[in-house]
């Protein structure tokens, strides 16, 4: 079930509806900064809502932070967001000492947009990086200040200047991104779509979401992305280092 969050430890599991699922609003529109929702359940892990704009930790991308606002104006800080016990449930983890919400209660949702937008820009930039460095991806992580990919490649083939220049040239092309859905069976028939060896595509609902950058990239991804790669602005290569036989790490940051 996952670790117990100290902010809600000791409270009994309470549910407003038998079906504890969450409408993933961030999946349909990553640019939603605020929304409204109803509390579905309170568990030892945190708060489950009937819908959310908060992206949960996954695919190397950090979970969103922000606040839930009660009808009386009281603000509950959300310190992290994680996946729930089912494919389409999301747990909002309140900061320690936060007031406890009640099942059925209506709340307003506000994400830390500046942080999220940085994550979106960097996540899309990493997709471009995976096209510039043509090698199996063995790991990755996206934080607000920088992102990184690990590659199974010889260090001698990684030149920071070339990588930075080619990635920024792709960004400058200003290509719009697209969301494509395929079935699990269609993905199984096209294994080459999966570049990342350490992260499995988001399965479980019978279909898989792909990020398409026409003419550049197509791969499974459940994360949040910019509408046009020009929004990334530009990136800089922070460092390249050897993390092991099959892990050569390329770290990037936004240039502005």
Each model region followed by its residue ranges:
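Active-/binding-site microenvironments in catalytic and ligand-binding cores
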Residues: 2-256
């Amino acid at each position: 079930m996952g670790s117990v969050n100290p902010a809600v430890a000791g409270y009994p599991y309470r549910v407003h509806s038998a079906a504890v699922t969450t409408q993933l609003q961030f999946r349909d529109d990553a640019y939603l900064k605020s929304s409204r929702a109803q509390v579905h359940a309170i568990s030892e892990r945190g708060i489950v809502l009937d819908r959310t704009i908060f992206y949960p930790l996954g695919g190397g991308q950090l979970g969103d932070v922000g606040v839930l606002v009660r009808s009386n104006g009281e603000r509950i800080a959300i310190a992290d967001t994680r996946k729930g016990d089912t494919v389409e449930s999301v747990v909002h983890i309140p900061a320690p000492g936060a007031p406890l919400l009640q099942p059925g209660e209506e709340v307003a949702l506000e994400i830390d947009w500046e942080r999220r937008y940085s994550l979106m820009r960097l996540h899309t930039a990493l997709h471009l990086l995976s096209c510039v460095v043509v090698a199996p991806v063995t790991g990755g992580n996206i934080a607000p200040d920088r992102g990184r990919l690990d590659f199974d490649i010889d260090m001698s083939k990684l030149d920071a200047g070339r990588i930075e220049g080619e990635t920024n040239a792709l960004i400058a092309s200003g290509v719009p991104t697209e969301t494509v859905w395929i079935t699990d069976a269609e993905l199984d028939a096209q294994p080459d779509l999966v570049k990342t060896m350490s992260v499995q595509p988001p399965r479980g609902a019978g279909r898989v979401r792909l990020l398409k950058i026409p003419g550049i990239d197509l791969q499974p991804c459940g994360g949040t992305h910019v509408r046009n790669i020009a929004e990334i602005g530009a990136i800089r290569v922070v460092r390249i280092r050897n993390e092991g036989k099959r892990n050569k790490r390329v770290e990037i940051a936004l240039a502005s």
